[in-house]
Structure formats: C-alpha cells, structure tokens
Amino acid sequence: MPSDFVGRFFLFIFASRMHKMITILGPTASGKTPVAARLASEIGGEVISADSRQVYRRMDIGTGKDLDDFTLTVNHETITVPYHLIDIREPGTKYNLFEYQQDFYDVYQDIRRRGKEPILCGGTGLYIEAVLKGYKLSPVPQNQPLRDSLEGKPLTELTEMLTELKARNGSVMHNTTDVDSCQRAIRAIEIETYNLEHPTPRRELPSVDSIIIGIDIDRDLRREKITRRLQKRLEEGMVDEVQALLREGIPAEDLIYYGLEYKFVTEYLTRQVTYDEMFKRLEIAIHQFAKRQMTWFRGMERRGFVIHWIDSTLPMEEKIERIKELWQ
C-alpha cells in the first residue's frame, strides 16, 4: 500500500473520533437524495454519493443525478448543499470499488477537517458496505487468458461461475445488481479469481462509525414511482443523452456495460429493439434492480448492520427530526 495512502489512514482514524457519520440508503425511487440534502442543510453537512454510475460526467438523466435536489431555500435564502463523488470520471472508463473506497476516504477526511458533517447517501450497497466495514481491496489486473476463455458464454453460465467463486471466497462482493451484463460478469469473475489466488486479510482499513438510515418505500408505491420516473426521464431527453455519448465516440458496448438505462437505450439506438420493447424491458429491469437493492440491504442487516428504517411517505420535517433524534 503506498505510503501516502497509509498517511491518509492516520488522518482518517483521527477524523473518525468525531460525530458518527450518517448513512442514508434505500432502493431507487425511494427519495434518498432530497432527505440527505435537507438534513445536510440543517446540520452543516456535505453529501458523499454512493452511486456506482453517478460518478460519470454527462450521464445525468439516465443515472438520476437530480442535482436540483441540492439547491434548497432556507430562511428565504437559496443555498447549495455541497456534494461529492458525482461527475468525477469520463464516460467510457470503468470506475471500480477499489477507486471508490480511496476516493471516499479522501473526501470523508476533507469534510471532517473542515468541521462539517459527512452524509453518505446512495443505493449501491456494495460501495456503502465496503467503506463502512473498511474492506481491504486491491487493484486487480486484467487476466486476458481468463477473459478469452469466458468470451461467448451466456450470462446465466457466467453468473453460476461467479456464485461458485463467491462461495469459495466467502465474498459479499458482486451481487447480481452489479453483474447484469456479460462484460460486468466477466470482470467480477476476474476479480474473484484474483482474490482467490491472492488471499489477503479482509479487514485492514479503518471502519467508519455510522448511523444507518434506510428509506422504506412500499413495494407498490415504489413500482408506481419507477414507472412514472422512467416516463419523465424519456420525456426529458434520456434517448438524446445516450445518442450524444455515442456520437462522442464512446463504444456501444461500453454504454451497455453501465446497465439499465444506458444498456436498453443503446440497444434501441443500435436498432436491436423497438422503442416499445426498450421501454418495457427497461421498466422490468429497473423493478428487478430495486428488488435486488433491497435484498442487499437485508443482507447487510444479517451481516450485523443496524438499519433504522423510516417510512418514505412521512413529511420531510418528520423524517429529518427522526434522523436527528437517532443521530444525537
């Protein structure tokens, strides 16, 4: 581990002796971000995103950045809540968990040094768990012979291979939320294979003391919001957004790698499916994604995390007061 990274850990340990961090998690369409932004405005906080796709610039509508949520009116004044780890990478690159963990520690310590309160907010459970538990991760090099041997295998077979590797590793990484394409599954197999061949202690980095808030949304309401939001995003130009990325020269397979909106809209733009087929398949995929997110969060609870669930339909003021009571 580089010496400068070790030095940052000492600062991190010092920063961790302060107030508990607040983590706000929940499935897609549960309304996490407005809660995090409002809370930050009231406690002098800054929001750290835990979303594996919002790191990419110019991928705004499809990833649901909703940056307007960070602009609030407080006491008749307009304020912008600081946010982090959004728009930090170029489309076409592949941001990974190892990079996120390092970026999180840097941002977390900077917020603490300035006397502000960090609020981790997102739906990528693997990212959240990795930083809260301080999992030791390593950058995994490409294994071209392995990739060549996996090329052409269907996603179902790749998923079975990954499940077997995870069982051998005792790994909590790479659930099906993160491997919804063959390219992503092959990379996950590559990582799990490397970790199996190069075992390291799972916990070497400092964990983060955090109170965890879950935004609990009724299944039927969640499904209704997902469908309504998808229609709105398409009306707001999501297809044009993906088309612009393709015109930049970003390969279609790279956009498909990002999954969900970018996968299905790219398939539509490359004439693999009709518009109606794209909408129906994408709608189903997002519903399945939300279900898998909840499965991950329930798994976190089984692994010892305490999540305080708050009803998504409560008025914002009640949500904020409830979180403050738990935090203080």
Region annotations inferred by a language model:
Residues 10-328:
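Phosphate/pyrophosphate-binding catalytic cores of soluble transferases and nucleic-acid-acting enzymes
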Residues 1-10:
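Positively charged N-terminal leader segments that act as targeting/secretion signals
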